[in-house]
Amino acid sequence: MTGTLPTQFKDSDLSPLTRPNALGRFGKYGGQYVPETLIPALIELEQAAKEAWKDSSFNSELNHLLKTYVGRSTPLYEATRLTEHYRKNTLKGPRIWLKREDLNHTGAHKINNALGQALLAIRMGKKRIIAETGAGQHGVATATVCARFGLECIIYMGKEDMRRQALNVFRMQLLGASVRPVTSGTATLKDATSEAIRDWVTNVETTHYILGSVAGPHPYPMLVRDFHAVIGEETKQQCKQAFGRSPDVLLACVGGGSNAMGLFHSFVEDKSVRMIGVEAAGDGVETGRHAATITEGRVGVLHGAMSLLLQDKDGQVEEAHSISAGLDYPGVGPEHSYLKEIGRAEYAAVTDTEAIEALQLVSKLEGIIPALETAHAFAYLEKLCPTLNHNSEIVINCSGRGDKDVNTVAEKLGSEI
């Protein structure tokens, strides 16, 4: 199964659980808090997306490229040794399955969205593409599809993230992208996003902004989710083939939240399926050096949308911290804030140390080196597994591979490469 028509455009009578309202809001979250100059571009983008999903030629091209270029569908893999590890003492605990988004072309889920938005940009006649990136995976995916379609590509990346993710910086440059360092603030993802938005305001007539997460102004949270919904659609079918029913638990890391929403979306209305997002607790939530936005955040506006944000007592957005560049963000997608508020999804946070330990464990037990972002989801198994019985089935979104993080992990462990 690849790239089927997203639920968003199949039925005008969908419940509020599966789509934003006419104002682009999930409950009170979302909206369009942007300069007037961007409103026409956002309207154009939403209209182009609606028309594209109804166009059989667009769907055919997207599905063909998802299959032959990206490599979908990605497998659902039974992690038998990881399952045994958590069952060894108590003989209870879930059977663990991995949705292998790390096997996509470019090594992460990000290309699902980058490919779809590139096709929309071409449809709108936009030949200049900009994007923000933290861990570099969205930047690499965007540079990849721009190379595929012959589009100009500019990537904004915080200087600190460029240091942490030097391999991905070179990959982007090798693919023909111009990588522009951002030195403001903490020189990480929030600052790169702000710089990309400034570029877009200036060049809105000729430029499409391929936003990399389910954040930002409407229609981006909906659009990015819908391009990633293939993850959950495939998972639902694969689970039925593997064990005859839907899983009991879905587990995914959450920064902005695109990989999690891609997995969750097809299951949102099935209340029998628990959905758990795992944020970055950094040095520990109690230290103030973390990126646990849903756990510790308050309602505010950042990058064009109302959502939960890390803020100080005066309402100023605080700096986030995580060893994972892809989770190092003080906001979260508005749909996640909504799902948390209505009690449909659960959210937890794990520390840098816990994520590093989980990365090592999964590598040694399954021969799969997950990205540091993904390792946060794996780390939560330590707390989750003892609470589940042996008949439970859990699916973890293995959102990316860890090649890009080897230097960071080695440095953290005191090893030299």
From Swiss-Prot:
The keyword Amino-acid biosynthesis applies. Gene3D superfamilies: 3.40.50.1100. CDD domains: Trp-synth_B. GO terms for cellular component: cytoplasm. InterPro entries: Trp_synth_b_CS (IPR006653), Trp_synth_beta (IPR006654), Trp_synth_beta/beta-like (IPR023026), TrpB-like_PALP (IPR001926), TrpB-like_PALP_sf (IPR036052). Pfam families: PALP. Keywords: Amino-acid biosynthesis, Aromatic amino acid biosynthesis, Lyase, Pyridoxal phosphate, Tryptophan biosynthesis. Its EC number is 4.2.1.20. It catalyses: (1S,2R)-1-C-(indol-3-yl)glycerol 3-phosphate + L-serine = D-glyceraldehyde 3-phosphate + L-tryptophan + H2O. Its cofactor is pyridoxal 5'-phosphate. Pathway: Amino-acid biosynthesis; L-tryptophan biosynthesis; L-tryptophan from chorismate: step 5/5. One of its GO terms (molecular function) is tryptophan synthase activity. The modification N6-(pyridoxal phosphate)lysine is found at residue 110. The beta subunit is responsible for the synthesis of L-tryptophan from indole and L-serine. Belongs to the TrpB family. PANTHER family: TRYPTOPHAN SYNTHASE, TRYPTOPHAN SYNTHASE-RELATED. Tetramer of two alpha and two beta chains. This is Tryptophan synthase beta chain. It comes from Prochlorococcus marinus (strain NATL1A). The gene is trpB.
